[in-house]
Amino acid sequence: MRITDFDALRLQVSQPELDAYRARNTPELDDLTAYLSGEDNLLDAQAIAAHLFATEPVDVFLSHAHADHDAVVALAVTLERLGLRVFVDACVWGDVYALLLKVDQARAGIPGEPGVFNYTRATRNAANMYMILSVALQRMIDQSELLLFLDSSAVRVQDYVEGEAYIGSPWIFAELMFAQMVARRPRLAGIGTENLSEALARNEAGATAPMVRYRLPESSHTMPSATLKRLISSATFAATLATRFRLRSSSYDFLDQFYRELPLSAAERELLGWADEAR
């Protein structure tokens, strides 16, 4: 699901709320030995994924560009207020780079040259780490009910081909491609991500690294950010009334209203358990 003009979405979230969300969702790094196993000090993919990513399914997975991080966390906080479980992996990536640096220092360092690494070993370390994270992200997407691709000017690169849209993030590209292929399952009685390559795109001198452009995968549905904001405002008001008058309220109330704004197919309605409802 693509949210267009995400740049225009302005949500009222206080700085303490933003800081609290990041604190709750930023895992602390353990000692490197916790992720190594065997005599050859092999990276333990399962241990890394289990530590950095939630094990419980989430309602909403936020897929986004690194530059939109603050606005994405504000959206996550707002959706959490409505009772939804939200995954924003931007809070994880900083630890990933710190962990990768520790791995390089332990397995790719050149004796007598601090901060200098063996290129081949460091490249393999990065490839292994990114593969581990890619699989973990796919698992999170598979376990979520809804993936929201937050499309903004920060996501895209200059488009030189008329009628074609491109993005500069390999991670967003991978997430959206996987979301197209993942099996859709009936609702049980959710999508983000920070762009890894963007976070490393500037070296110490401030130069921008070469960027690859990726054709933007199509989304099953599209919604303007203004519509999303209207739905959030309506759901927030309804939740306030429910609390005041002790009425029944569910996190699915917002998702149901969200889905009703979309031109759902018969198959999608059936997955939501709405097949028997009057059209």
Which residue stretches match the model-derived regions?
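Acidic, metal/cofactor-coordinating or nucleic-acid-engaging core segments within structured domains
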Residues: 119-122, 135, 142, 181-197
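Conserved TIR/SEFIR loop-to-helix hotspot centered on a Trp-containing motif
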Residues: 128-129, 155-185
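C-terminal interaction surface of TIR/SEFIR-family domains
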Residues: 1-51, 184-279
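Glycine-rich, N-terminal phosphate-binding loop of Rossmann-like dinucleotide-binding domains
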Residues: 151
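Conserved N-terminal substructure of TIR/SEFIR domains
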Residues: 1-144, 263-279
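Short catalytic/ligand-binding loop motif for oxyanion handling, primarily in non-cytosolic enzymes
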Residues: 70-71, 94-98, 156-159, 197-200
